Amino acid sequence: MARPALLGELLVLLLWTATVGQVAAATEVQPPVTNLSVSVENLCTIIWTWSPPEGASPNCTLRYFSHFDDQQDKKIAPETHRKEELPLDEKICLQVGSQCSANESEKPSPLVKKCISPPEGDPESAVTELKCIWHNLSYMKCSWLPGRNTSPDTHYTLYYWYSSLEKSRQCENIYREGQHIACSFKLTKVEPSFEHQNVQIMVKDNAGKIRPSCKIVSLTSYVKPDPPHIKHLLLKNGALLVQWKNPQNFRSRCLTYEVEVNNTQTDRHNILEVEEDKCQNSESDRNMEGTSCFQLPGVLADAVYTVRVRVKTNKLCFDDNKLWSDWSEAQSIGKEQNSTFYTTMLLTIPVFVAVAVIILLFYLKRLKIIIFPPIPDPGKIFKEMFGDQNDDTLHWKKYDIYEKQSKEETDSVVLIENLKKAAP
């Protein structure tokens, strides 16, 4: 009986000793790591490696604490390396220390720092506004603007890499879009988890005169689907039913939809967001794989409806939900009353009204004499009898009754007498 009790006490003593040793090791500050180095793989993969500290406590299960200079991305792990995909646009420094637990509150060893400098070259020569969009999960298109201190005849080269590639590849299809320069390359899903990877992009020139630019593109961001295809439009029971085919490579639950509905009776552009499938009673083949539908109630019977649809990714499957696809090709349905008849009527009615008004004016002028004949005025008779003289007087009043004297003229008068002879 004494031997089992002795063994139990010995086991407890050993456990207590180990615990005390671990606690002592945990509270003890460990030596710093050694041989810290940094290197670059692929295009933008930075790898820091180091060796365990010399003289570490034997009871310590080493963990390594690391973070960047801005105290971001703190990490505690047992590995003696750290790998990150980072753009090489500026100086990047990592600090590493050792400790005996994964507790962040534990004080690590003195930190050792190692930095990597940005690529050589004038920062103003690097390309700007470098962005990449994954189109319909089929190809990636990257575009950029030339740097400020760049020659107009610079020939650019774009390289890309992702984990499924053994080495980086060069994009061959470089072209211009206005002021932007762009390049497209095929990029499809190669494995189920491919969407959760990153693509490393680097743009530089053939002559090595500009600073290379590196960008890390997450495949769950900046995804732009192709426009959907409208399959059916149906007017039934005062409602408009719309069914469309979703773009390939996407599951319906990973997309958000917008439907634009316009009609000839109003000038409003109605854009409606589709939150759920509302075509429960649709007679079309709505259960076909990759199709979605929408129902708009309260449509007008005498109007033509024009419909367009567009889609974007949602955050159920992707990190980004801002890039809408282009609008689908518009399709119309409905019957409108004969607009030619109304147009003709609108043009002819004013002409008829104008002609009728002119005829009526002439007719009223003659009709006035018949309806309103002149009334005899007895006073006019006396006015004519007694008023003529006054009128004549007034008429002659404006004339001068005295004639102006003309100039006197004097003529000589010769008297000729005819003398008769006296009788003898």
Swiss-Prot record:
Glycosylation sites: 35, 59, 103, 136, 262, 338
Protein name (Swiss-Prot/TrEMBL): Interleukin-13 receptor subunit alpha-1
Gene designation per UniProt: Il13ra1
GO cellular component: membrane
Gene3D superfamilies tied to this protein: Immunoglobulins
Domain remark text: The WSXWS motif appears to be necessary for proper protein folding and thereby efficient intracellular transport and cell-surface receptor binding.
Chain positions of motif WSXWS motif: 324-328
Its membrane topology: Single-pass type I membrane protein
InterPro entries in the cross-refs: FN3_dom (IPR003961), FN3_sf (IPR036116), Ig-like_fold (IPR013783), Il13Ra_Ig (IPR040566), Short_hematopoietin_rcpt_2_CS (IPR003532), TypeI_recpt_CBD (IPR015321)
Summary of the tissues where the protein is detected: Spleen, liver, thymus, heart, lung, kidney, testis, stomach, brain, skin, and colon; but not skeletal muscle.
Stretches assigned to the Fibronectin type-III domain: 32-121, 224-336
